Amino acid sequence: MLNTDLRILKPYYITTAIDYTNAPPHIGHAYEKVLADVMARFQRLNGREVFFLTGVDQHGQKVQKSAEKAGVSPREFVDGVTEKFVSLWAKLGVHYDGWAATVDEKHKRVVQAMLQKLHDKDQLYKKSYAGFYSVRQEQFLTDKERGADGSFGEEWGEVVELQEENWYFKLSEHIEWLRGFIKSHPDFIFPTFRANDVLNALDGGQDLCISRPKERLSWGIPLPFDDRFVNYVWFDALVNYISFAGFLADEVGNENMPDFKKIWPADAHVIGKDILVPAHAIYWPIMLHAMGFSDDEMPRLIVHGWWNVNGVKMSKTLGNVVDPNNVADIVTPDGLRYYLMRDMTTGYDADLSDERMMIAYNKELAGGLGNLLNRALSMAQKYRTGLLSQNSGYDDEVNQSLRATVAAAPAAYFEKMNAWSIHEGIAEAWKIITHANQFVDITAPFKLAKDEAQAARLDSVLYHLAEALAHVSVLLSPIIPEACVKMRAQLGWQMPDGFQVSDLKWGLLNDGHQLGQPVPLFPRLELATTEAK
């Protein structure tokens, strides 16, 4: 028996990286947020309370420079870019429970309280440093970042020499703890092979500069014990995962916050592979460890890959950055969600392809799912005025085979989805669609309708098709939520409140159930380019 009741567990706390507000969103941002939204919806579909946090990273040197270039204040600049992210998430159906904005005073209070606590614990100290600094990545560089020829790679952008005094966090004191933690907690990072990247990066670990002088960077959170400096943007940004989850809320006076003890640790920090090392896999767990968090209170990192275009990483220089707004306008928001989840294996890179996207839309969504729904409803309306007969008295091996496929899907779907194998979860649901389309071809309802002696068999065929589609509308609801709502409306069936995957049993549609009229779910599209130069 399928056991997917997760209500006995703590609330599922899932976060994404907060997006840097120096530029508008691209397809990589969209993938990450849709991935997290799909998992949040899946967990809710299994009876679990969920807190889904996403947001924007609004401080830092890149923002300050972008604002200066645009001739506006940093706050005005980030507000404008933030609105683009908010509007895109609404368009794509990304339904979050908490919004993290690092200019929020609630966040600032927690960051400053943490800094003060670390200072009081003698975890911070001030020293002078002379060396190289990456303007793009907003961090100091060491010889470890040099290539074989002694130069710094393109990923660092403009590199300048700096000599200045700053505050440092005693990161190196905790390196051996982190090494042991990673080795003894294989579930800390998914996929597990990414752990080797982290372990390799721990050798020769140095302390972390956590400040920038105000004379160079004014757009940031001031250090509570030395207001000549602002906090390093990565330290500030990482704290969002706990500041907006209610950490220190009572102590700093933050009201209307989640119950931190109830939802922490995070079940999933969904991030890109480019920010695993050093930020999320080194800085963040060590920051928590230094604050007194136990090993059992460490979050889990879910690391996804990159979307490339024709095998090449997206970049402004190459002009191949894809705008998700434009793509969603072409293939619909659900069409984009489906393609992103279908064509990427969580943790690995994928290639964005116009051709594959159109195949996914036209062949699978329109031709597979949409056409099945249209045929099932049209035949039911034509032959039975949309009324279903659950107890026709007819059964055969063809019916039984379809019922077996429908019955097997929930457990396999749950296993794949719960393991972050979203594309395989989709495939398990799609087995019903494929089988149901074959079922139509085998049973040929239009022929049965011509023979009154086959009336009971026709009733059973029409019921089996509608019932199978009701199951599909549940399983695919985390992936294509808007389309599934439309499916259920056309089927004349609404999921009861609290309905779970484990409630999927044959007989969702009662005897005498009235189906609605068919409306194209995914109208076919002409081949179009989705690249936005």
Predicted regions and their residues:
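Generic structural marker for isolated residues within well-ordered, non-membrane alpha-helices
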Residues: 63, 82-85, 284, 324, ...
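Conserved, charged catalytic cores of large soluble enzymes
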Residues: 2, 7-21, 38-210, 247, ...
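Structured secondary-structure scaffolds
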Residues: 2, 7-47, 51-54, 106-110, ...
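Generic structural concept
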Residues: 366, 370, 403, 407, ...
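Short, charged/polar, low-complexity loop and linker segments
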Residues: 349-354, 407-415
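Short, mixed-charge aromatic SLiMs
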Residues: 139-143, 268, 307-312, 363, ...
